């Protein structure tokens, strides 16, 4: 498997890893900043794709274990700069003959070390730009990362193979670290071109002072998932209507500090100008009606009418279509509220507002207050 094939494999596997990381990543961002910054998302996922590509380049292709008969001692090189000696000994390079220069560039003794240098250049750029590492820290982290890759090879993919199937080479660490140093120097371009990490953080905090529709929607999703898991356990102990569990959860739990578990996880809470207890309970009942009773009622009516449907029941078919469009309208409305940062109908009826509980610097809060006036 060549370099291009390995990179294609990384690109194909990336969506699955991205899917697994999305929910935890969003929760961490909401907890830390109160918002999910688009540029930060782009940087994060590109960094994950890059790391996955590097890792796969190190371990692929995976050989047949029955064909591995190597020992650990013969698959390790601890002599530094052996690649320089190999280049002058094995490549066709001759300083006096310019015609050999291009041939030397195509020889493995040149392009393999060159690729090792190039492979870690982006790592240095990421460390300088986004992670704000100094030069010494960048070099140290790169050396450790490269050492991890070499130990992965030396261990035969963490002893899954009877022996190493690739050479663990100290020269690889030298080349990788050199590449990262070059990447660190090139990182000034990203610092000049893109907003700084501090500017990204500041913008995230500013946006996070207001609870977005997506943040609310994610909190509701977390609440309903946790309640469904909880109900699966409670139902075995005692028969309790699911709607009753929902009503107790959304109407009574927020009476304590104005939060459900989903809200607490994403760091925001309910706020009422007056009649907090009464409005909280009223809102909880409306939440159950909106997210459970309305869709369940529509599904029930559609199922009921469908069971009585005959070839000549045009009226019944029309009613089913009408209910289906009502359900579709409900879904579109809910999605629009989340994406357009609008308030849910139950929040409007109950007079509920949301407050972010993410800690923000006083200077940012002051600027945000002045800009909203």
Predicted feature locations:
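Individual transmembrane alpha-helices with interfacial aromatic-anchor signatures
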Residues: 167-178
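Bulky hydrophobic segments
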Residues: 1-164, 181-266, 272-373
């Amino acid at each position: 498997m060549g370099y291009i094939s390995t990179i294609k494999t990384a690109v194909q596997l990336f969506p699955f890893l991205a899917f697994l990381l999305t929910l935890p990543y969003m929760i961490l961002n909401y907890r830390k900043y109160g918002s999910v910054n688009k540029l930060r998302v782009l940087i994060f996922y590109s960094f994950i794709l890059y790391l996955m590509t590097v890792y796969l380049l190190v371990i692929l292709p995976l050989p047949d274990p029955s064909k591995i008969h190597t020992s650990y001692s013969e698959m390790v090189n601890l002599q530094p700069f052996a690649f320089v000696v190999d280049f002058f000994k094995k490549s066709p390079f001759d300083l006096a003959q310019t015609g050999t220069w291009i041939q030397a560039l195509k020889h493995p003794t040149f392009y393999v070390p060159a690729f090792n240098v190039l492979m870690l250049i982006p790592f240095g750029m990421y460390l300088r730009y986004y992670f704000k590492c100094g030069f010494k820290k960048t070099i140290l982290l790169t050396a450790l990362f490269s050492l991890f890759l070499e130990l992965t090879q030396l261990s035969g993919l963490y002893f899954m193979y009877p022996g190493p199937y690739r050479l663990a080479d100290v020269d690889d660490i030298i080349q990788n670290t050199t590449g990262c140093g070059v990447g660190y120097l090139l990182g000034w371009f990203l610092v000049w071109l893109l907003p700084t990490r501090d500017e990204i953080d500041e913008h995230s905090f500013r946006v996070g002072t207001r609870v977005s529709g997506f943040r609310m929607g994610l909190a509701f999703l977390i609440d309903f998932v946790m309640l469904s898991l909880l109900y699966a356990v409670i139902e075995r102990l005692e028969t309790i209507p699911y709607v009753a569990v929902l009503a107790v959860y959304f109407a009574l739990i927020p009476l304590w500090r104005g939060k459900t578990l989903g809200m607490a996880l994403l760091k925001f809470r309910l706020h009422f100008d007056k009649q907090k207890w009464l409005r909280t309970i009223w809102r909880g009942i409306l939440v159950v009606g909106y997210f459970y009773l309305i869709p369940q009622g529509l599904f029930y009516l559609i199922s009921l009418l469908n069971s009585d449907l005959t070839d000549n029941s045009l009226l019944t078919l029309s009613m089913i279509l009408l209910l289906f469009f009502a359900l579709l309208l409900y879904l579109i409305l809910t999605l629009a509220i989340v994406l357009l940062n609008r308030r849910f109908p139950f929040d409007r009826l109950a007079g509920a507002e949301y407050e972010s509980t993410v800690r923000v610097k006083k200077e940012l809060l002051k600027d945000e207050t002045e800009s909203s006036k």
